[in-house]
């Protein structure tokens, strides 16, 4: 007879098996039977916008002209969605860590979700404080289920406008042409996160000094149009298409001229997310 127990796919763990456990639902933790997140708490939640424009001379990094346009548009967009928006400018690594720690220690029990937007220089896996790099995973770890209990089972959205490497995308020409009746009380600590990156791993992310970044401006535009009627992943797909098809870099340096960009969405959300209820 075939063994129906589930096993761990890891070469470092041998002969280790775990049983599939069906538990009861937890109403206190924000985990519900519905297929969409509960978004009718008394508050939508906090939206922190970290806007790093000017960097210490020691880093050798240039000012991020146009980022204030992004920060202002984000504030307007998320305030319209009823979030408590907190704008923070030119933070060092230590200040960013403290900000994230303190935010994770707040009582989010009456809030539906959490949003953090980071506008800065970056590289793969890191973003820059004004004085140097910091691992993105370190910042997001403070909001894991085992550290931030009041956000368990609630969507935690991290929106990152930053480069993820130095590759350039030249583009390519194209041809024209039933509800579950049980919910487990125990959920993974990494569940219910979504990371919306402005670009794919390894690539540059583009920003216009006058109009702001392609990604953030497209995100705000699509949220304004569709936040009241579409699920968030569907909105992000439209953001991807807008950035991919409507933008192309212009530079007197041929190396950087006529380049493209595609945002990258990494979702560990366990339900559909609607900003309306």
Curated annotation (Swiss-Prot):
Inhibited by BIRC6; following inhibition of BIRC6-caspase binding by DIABLO/SMAC, BIRC6 is subjected to caspase cleavage, leading to an increase in active caspases. This is Caspase-3. It holds the Pfam family Peptidase_C14. Coiled coil: none annotated. Keywords: Acetylation, Apoptosis, Cytoplasm, Hydrolase, Phosphoprotein, Protease, S-nitrosylation, Thiol protease, Ubl conjugation, Zymogen. Cleavage by granzyme B, caspase-6, caspase-8 and caspase-10 generates the two active subunits. Additional processing of the propeptides is likely due to the autocatalytic activity of the activated protease. Active heterodimers between the small subunit of caspase-7 protease and the large subunit of caspase-3 also occur and vice versa. GO terms for biological process: apoptotic process; erythrocyte differentiation; keratinocyte differentiation; neuron differentiation; positive regulation of amyloid-beta formation; positive regulation of neuron apoptotic process; proteolysis; regulation of protein stability. The modification Phosphoserine is found at residue 26. Involved in the activation cascade of caspases responsible for apoptosis execution. At the onset of apoptosis, it proteolytically cleaves poly(ADP-ribose) polymerase PARP1 at a '216-Asp-|-Gly-217' bond. Cleaves and activates sterol regulatory element binding proteins (SREBPs) between the basic helix-loop-helix leucine zipper domain and the membrane attachment domain. Cleaves and activates caspase-6, -7 and -9 (CASP6, CASP7 and CASP9, respectively). Cleaves and inactivates interleukin-18 (IL18). Triggers cell adhesion in sympathetic neurons through RET cleavage. It comes from Mesocricetus auratus.
């Amino acid at each position: 007879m075939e063994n129906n127990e589930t096993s761990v796919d890891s070469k470092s763990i041998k002969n280790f098996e775990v049983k599939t456990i069906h538990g009861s639902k937890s109403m206190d933790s924000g985990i519900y039977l519905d297929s969409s997140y509960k978004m009718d708490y008394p508050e939508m939640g906090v939206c922190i916008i970290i806007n790093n424009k000017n960097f210490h001379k020691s880093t050798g990094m240039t000012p991020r002209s146009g980022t204030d346009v992004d920060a202002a548009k984000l504030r307007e967009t998320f305030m319209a969605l009823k979030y408590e928006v907190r704008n923070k400018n030119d933070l060092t690594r230590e200040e960013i860590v403290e900000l994230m720690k303190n935010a994770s220690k707040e009582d989010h029990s009456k809030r539906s979700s959490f949003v953090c937007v980071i506008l800065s220089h970056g590289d793969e896996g890191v973003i820059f404080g004004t004085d140097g790099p910091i691992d993105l995973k370190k910042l997001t770890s403070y909001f894991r289920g085992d550290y931030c209990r009041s956000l368990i089972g609630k969507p935690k959205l991290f929106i990152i406008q930053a480069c993820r490497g130095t590759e350039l995308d030249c583009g390519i020409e194209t041809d024209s042409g039933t509800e579950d009746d049980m919910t487990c009380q125990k959920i993974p600590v990494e569940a219910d996160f979504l990371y919306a990156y402005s670009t794919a791993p390894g690539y540059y992310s583009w920003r216009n000094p006058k109009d702001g970044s392609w990604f953030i401006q497209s995100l705000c535009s699509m949220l304004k149009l569709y936040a009241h009627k579409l699920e968030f992943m569907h909105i992000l797909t439209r953001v991807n298409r807008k950035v991919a098809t409507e933008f192309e870099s212009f530079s007197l340096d041929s190396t950087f001229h006529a380049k493209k960009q595609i945002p990258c969405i990494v979702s560990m959300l366990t339900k559909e997310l609607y900003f309306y209820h």
